A protein has these predicted regions:
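Non-heme di-metal
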Residues: 1-155
Length: 155
């Protein structure tokens, strides 16, 4: 959520039309942290310990780089991150949830986030395609491609 809020605040006036997309995306993503914590608890984990935990170094690097790029370079680059995360989720979430559940014998309730995102993110990918197709500035396209390349490496 903080990355989306930073994106919305940093979008230049020439991209004012994308602000509604960012607001819609914020509404869509709100509460997803709780879904993950619910799944951790359903799998027998400690939701409170998970909420207090710190991210691994790769996750921290990915988020920090995206934040820095939004704040200091070109905020449009954020859509490169969305491309990687939503595209990966749409492609892998449902199969991944099934494989993990079968291997570990966990209940259905431990996979609400992954299973919902396997479906939701397919719609997000379509929305993202519309956004990407609206970007014609070569600097914007280069910025989102650069962040996408970096995030593929860290993700």
């Amino acid at each position: 959520m903080p990355l989306l809020m930073a994106l919305g605040a940093r979008l230049p006036d020439r991209h004012a039309g994308l602000r509604n997309n960012v607001l819609h995306y914020l509404e869509e993503e709100n509460g997803h942290d709780d879904w993950i914590l619910n799944d951790i608890e359903a799998a027998g984990g400690d939701r409170h310990a998970a909420a207090r935990s710190t991210p691994n170094v790769e996750t921290e690097a990915m988020v920090a780089y995206a934040w820095d790029t939004i704040m200091r370079r070109n905020p449009i680059s954020f859509f490169g991150m969305v491309f990687v995360l939503e595209g990966s989720s749409a492609a892998l979430a449902l199969r991944g949830a099934d494989a993990i559940q079968n291997a570990l014998g966990l209940p259905d309730g431990a996979f609400s986030y992954l299973r919902s995102h396997g479906t939701l993110d397919q719609e997000h990918v379509k929305d993202l395609a519309n956004i990407l197709n609206s970007l014609s500035d070569p600097e914007d396209r280069a910025a989102l491609a650069a962040l996408r390349r970096y995030l593929r490496w860290t993700y």
